[in-house]
From Swiss-Prot:
Binding-site positions, ATP: G122, T123, H124, G125, K126, T127, T128
Function, as annotated: Cell wall formation.
Protein origin, superkingdom: Bacteria
Protein's name in the database: UDP-N-acetylmuramate--L-alanine ligase
Family as reported in the entry's similarity comment: Belongs to the MurCDEF family.
Length: 480
């Protein structure tokens, strides 16, 4: 029997078994977990087992390793990510048998349809902002359902079924699938030139798609928009929905002043219309996280959450996996090095993290291990990468994570090393994806350094390995 939270209409009443093709993906596993908790039968396939598939299996999902037509036998609907095409044997078999095959975002839209949906869109900051909203709502006693692209450290998962009518989720523009969503509240954090293949290389088309997404709101909904971003500011006059703006700009409806950062913690004062100034702090570094917090405060205030709960939810926020996640200290001669892991894979995200490190730890050197993600992104944003990566004190560049793409001449890590070296300020070190990083990086480290491992590919496995490596006599720490 499918269970629904109080006040939520039961959905998909003709559907019993739901099969996910690519169930281990960040965008897929959260939806699968919520559906399992609602009482649906869930199965799924992926190319390899992982901690994610093992977790879903413990919750009752049937997991298949590898893609075969028979995996989907008995399914009433297939859910696919944008990485799965019609030639996939499970998809081909379902289409032949006239079983519905729906994109991930359409299934998310079904979960959101009869709930008070809060969708967070934007090129950068979606995961952290969605996580902050879920945390503040929980602090306010609203117990939301959430589906997030990263693991919320406090919950130990990236998805959870709540008892209230609220559902908080990321809205993915990478394949324009966020157009399936019809939320009550939508956030746009920023709009940048990324995933341009989806939009035929046309930035105007990307902007128009964000406008279309915001007009999926009902006429009584709410658009929450960051006016510090020039593109968001540009599209603002086109939005015919109730709107609240936020940012550091003086004309923002909700803005932050008196910003101060010490290490991981950032303090600031929030100014809101017809409200007393609110002093808050968040256990995350950087101005970008002040903006993520402001979006959260706008929505929490609009939903009637008390200032006390807002302050508590932000102050106690334990972060998200791979978003400036502090693993602990690596022991080196004369002291230790702080080890940080981060998912940032766009020059703007890299710049935000470097700025946060310089702001919170101004006396420390930054030793950076970076892996570009996709050859197309490296090609399209090449000069931006050269500029921002050159701001590290020491740089090691791992070969590009292809994400299924074929190599593009001149858009790889060797060429990036060459271009950065030509600027004359830094001598980057190139290494292959299967190289052992520990003996390579240890001679480069000094006591007091910050070692940042950053990128969206398999670079994400390096920090967990380094903290356990006997070369560093590592002392583990909690994620930030």
């Amino acid at each position: 029997m499918v269970k629904e939270p109080n006040g939520v209409t039961r959905t998909m009443r003709r559907i019993r078994r739901i099969h996910f093709v690519g169930i281990g993906g960040a965008g897929m596993c959260g939806i699968a977990e919520v559906l399992l908790n609602l009482g649906y039968e869930v199965s799924g396939s992926d190319l390899k087992a992982s901690a994610v598939t093992e977790r879903l299996e413990k919750f009752g999902a049937q997991i298949f390793i590898g893609h075969q037509a028979e995996n989907a036998d008995g399914a009433d609907v297939l859910v696919v990510s944008s990485a799965i095409n019609r030639a996939n044997p499970e998809v081909a078999s379902a289409l032949e048998r006239r079983i519905p095959v729906v994109p991930r975002a359409e299934m998310l839209a079904e979960l959101m349809r009869y709930r008070h949906g809060i969708a967070v869109a934007g090129t950068h900051g979606k995961t952290t902002t969605t996580s902050l909203i879920a945390s503040v709502f929980a602090a306010g006693g609203l117990d939301p359902t959430f589906v997030i692209g990263g693991r919320l450290n406090a919950a130990g998962t990236n998805a959870q079924l709540g008892a209230s009518r609220y559902l908080v989720a990321e809205a993915d523009e990478s394949d324009a699938s966020f157009l399936h969503l019809q939320p009550m509240v939508a956030v746009v954090t920023n709009i940048d030139a990324d995933h341009m293949a989806t939009y035929g290389g046309d930035f105007n088309k990307l902007k128009k798609t964000f406008v279309e997404f915001l007009h999926n709101l009902p006429f009584y909904g709410l658009a929450v928009m960051c006016v510090d971003d020039p593109v968001v500011r540009e599209i603002l006059p086109q939005i015919a929905r109730p709107t609240v703006t936020y940012g550091l700009s003086e004309d923002a409806d909700v803005r932050a002043i008196n910003i101060r950062q010490e290490g991981m913690r950032t303090w600031f004062t929030v100014l809101r219309p017809e409200r007393e100034p609110l002093d808050v702090s968040v256990n995350m570094p950087g101005l970008h996280n002040v903006l993520n917090s402001l979006a959260t405060i706008v929505i929490a205030t609009d939903e009637g959450i008390s200032d006390e709960a807002i302050v508590q939810g932000l102050s106690g926020f334990q972060g998200v996996g791979r978003r400036f996640q502090v693993y602990g200290e690596l022991q080196v001669e004369g002291g230790s090095v702080m080890l940080v892991d981060d998912y940032g894979h766009h020059p703007r995200e890299v710049a935000a993290v470097i700025k946060a490190i310089r702001g919170g730890w101004p006396e420390r050197r930054l030793v950076m291990v970076y892996q570009p993600h996709r050859y197309t992104r490296t090609r399209d944003l090449y000069e931006d990468f050269v500029q921002v990566l050159g701001e590290a004190n020491v740089l090691l560049l791992m070969e590009v994570y292809p994400a299924g793409e074929e190599p593009i001449p001149g858009a790889d890590s060797r060429q990036l090393c060459h271009s950065i070296r030509q600027r004359g300020q830094l001598d980057p070190i190139y290494f292959e994806r299967d190289a052992d990083l520990a003996p390579l990086v240890k001679p480069l480290l000094r006591a007091g350094d910050i070692l940042l491992c950053q990128g969206a590919g398999d670079v994400g496995g390096l920090a967990p390995q380094l903290i356990k490596n006997p070369l560093f006599a590592g002392k583990g720490g909690k994620g930030a």
